[in-house]
Curated annotation (Swiss-Prot):
Alphabetical UniProt keywords: Hydrolase, Magnesium
Family, per entry: Belongs to the ComB family.
Source organism superkingdom: Bacteria
Organism encoding this protein: Clostridium perfringens (strain SM101 / Type A)
GO molecular function, one term: magnesium ion binding
SS bond partners: none
Cofactors that this protein relies on: Mg(2+)
Pfam families reported in the protein's UniProt record: 2-ph_phosp
Record's protein name: Probable 2-phosphosulfolactate phosphatase
The protein's enzyme class: hydrolase
SUPFAM superfamilies: ComB-like (SSF142823)
Amino acid sequence: MKIDVIISADYIDSEALKGKIAVVIDMLRATSVITTALYNGAKKVIPVVSVEEAFEKAKELKSLGEEVLLGGERKALKIDGFDFSNSPLEYKREIVEGKNVIMSTTNGTRALNLCSKADKVIVASVLNGQAVAKYLENEEKEIVFVNSGTNGEFSSDDFMCAGYIISELCKNKEVELTDIAKTAKYVYESSEGIEEFIKDAKHYNILKNLGLEEDLKYCSTKNLIDLVFEFKNGEIKTVESGIKVKI
């Protein structure tokens, strides 16, 4: 198994992902939100690129009698007319269970849609990192960890999350790492902890300055969730893999 890392959404070559497994990360905060919403019983999450597309999709689903919630952000702030911002702590079970969540964010939902030509697209965060690693042990195709980044730029939080999952995967699977994948693994294994390492990251401090310290702490917590989620046909749902992940 070969493992590679893409450092931001701007570097995604959709055609080059054909035949590969893409593992999309937007640790702060889209993939943490998706992981949390589905764990708390959301029927599915539909990631879209634009705000206009989100409203159109919501209208379409509501016309079919579906319950819909809108979540997302622009410049880390809630979008006018949406039900939620991009804080995972808002997606509580009593609110999202059984409902469709349509999301649009600056970085994460864009990255997910750019990866749609991959053979499989897995949604990953620190929250379910060990579960993702365990799931990937059963794959033989090349795996590409796709860091969403921040506005097209490298983001150390996503890189750290990729390094963490790669490190977990290497414990039980013989893999071939590209230089950048080796670097991500090394950075994670040499650190004093995920949140401690990313405290100097630009995006981390944008969120901190908005008073979102609880989000940052939550998104940096390992293995709260033992489920794996796949983006397929425009929707994200829990993987029905039959694999029991013990955490």
